[in-house]
Amino acid sequence: MVNNVLSRLPTAEAPGPMASLSPARRLLCSRAFLPFLALFVFFYYAALLTNGDFILWAPAIHPGDSEQSVFGFVYNNTLLHLLRGDFTIDIDAIGFEALIRDGKAYTYFGVMPAVLRLPLLPFVDLARIDVAPLSCCIAASLATLLKVSALRTACTASTARLRSDVLVWALLATFVLGGSSVPFLRATVYQEAILWEGVFASAFVVLALRGLTARDGFSPRILVLMTIAAGCCLLTRVVMATGLYAGILALLVWQFGGEIVRNSRDAPAGPSHARRGAGFRMPSTGRFIAPLIILAVFASAAGFINYQRFGHPLAFANFSVQTHLPTSHGVHLAGLPALEEYGEFHPRRIPYGLMYYFAPVWFVHSDNGGFLFDDYRKKIDLIEPPPSSFVVTDPLLLMLAAAGFGALCRRNRMALSRPAAALIAAGLALPPVLLLMAFAMAFRYRMEFYPLFVFLTLIGAFGIKPEIAAPRPRSTLGLVLFAMVGIVASHLVLAIYKISPWGDLNPGDDLWEIYQTGIRRFLTRRL
């Protein structure tokens, strides 16, 4: 009976004949599925983001503060200034994150989340109304729906249909309720930038998978859309955009070289000058020119904004002129010695970065009264709580991503184009590597890892040849258990994140006491 009902559902286009798909996959591809999922995701995320209040916009109570978000007026103020041709920002909106140059306040936050507020201008007084919670909720919802779309593309490919439906549902639950989405649901300007970055990176991953699974490969339309996603990301957060730019440029070079090789093979035998005149054809440059122009336009826009803000087209920020004013959040940094000595990125920080993101014991006190690994800690200016590990919040993704990485490294295992997938994965790996070397390590920077994890996960789960055994865990119990552990851990981490202190911990701080106090305060307000 269930099969009969599912077979009557209206369906959207999916790779291959729908009749050959399992009932679960047909449900995932039905036209009604994504709209219903979108409603659930938006309201569930809104509840988590606002602690159940569902206040997604609010008027300012103090200058630049609605008390519903942190620095919620930064992008409002940025847009209002941009509409006047002004690249400065009001100090009330940006607070201690202000970068002071020639007596004027600037921000290092990208302009794209501000530009995305343009449709609200006729209806909302952005000078008075904080819409940051709404923007965060929309961005988180879009990113999740794009990840589900990527799952749908991967699991319905002709070479992936023998993989278990339980694997499909476990990944669906993980993408919607797990570590790549839920832990970031906090209304701050930092989260808003990260969440919109996640939207553009997720769109890039979806398009990459469509190019890998489509019969005609990476069509001109897919390449153009991938460059637009990379360009929008560049105007949001440059670290993630670095990976997207690297991935799409490598893909274009590979395709261009492939066309040259194919045209050379098709040319008739004979002297080289005769081949050039008679049979040899230069690649069709039209499909490459449009993506390159789009990338150049976005890069030029970013360079122009940087020049107006910091006096140099390649300077996305200048933290040496940051105010670091003490605020109610208790954030105060006494200079940036590690930045000055080692720069923004340095390979000596990689061991500490791996520990911070995968085995977080950095908050444990040592015998001398400081923290563990203080020698490494001196190379970093900001180490932000809460402690969290991908191993706990994303066990299923890590297992499948490892399988995907193994498939890319070994010959004759990929059902998809191995060179193209490897180039995309290499581009997506660049942001995590940069973050492991960064002068600041923060919980929100985990977002930079997820596009790579999601892409490798879907390659490992559905991109391997069907005759090769599915990656572990293979049992229903194992898949469900890994997914549930990640989902529960992600919600717990979000709760801890919301009560975590801002900025660096002092040696005398005890995280356990801080969290106990935070829980008591939260319960007192609620009860």
Task: Describe the role of every protein-language-model region.
Residues 1-65, 69-70, 162-170, 279-294, ...:
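Start-transfer (signal-anchor) and selected internal transmembrane alpha helices
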Residues 100-138, 156-161, 183-187, 375-388:
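Juxtamembrane segments of multi-pass membrane glycosylation machinery
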Residues 130-161, 203-207, 402:
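Transmembrane-helix motifs of polytopic, lipid-linked glycan transferases
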Residues 147-179, 199, 215-222, 261-264, ...:
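Transmembrane-helix signature of polytopic, membrane-embedded enzymes
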Residues 196-216, 225-230, 244-247, 252-254, ...:
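Specific aromatic-rich, kink-prone transmembrane helix
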Residues 222-237, 244, 295-304:
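Membrane-interface alpha helices of multi-pass inner-membrane proteins
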Residues 243-296, 407-411:
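Perimembrane helix-loop-helix junctions
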Residues 249, 377-382, 386-418, 457:
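Hydrophobic, aromatic-rich transmembrane alpha-helices
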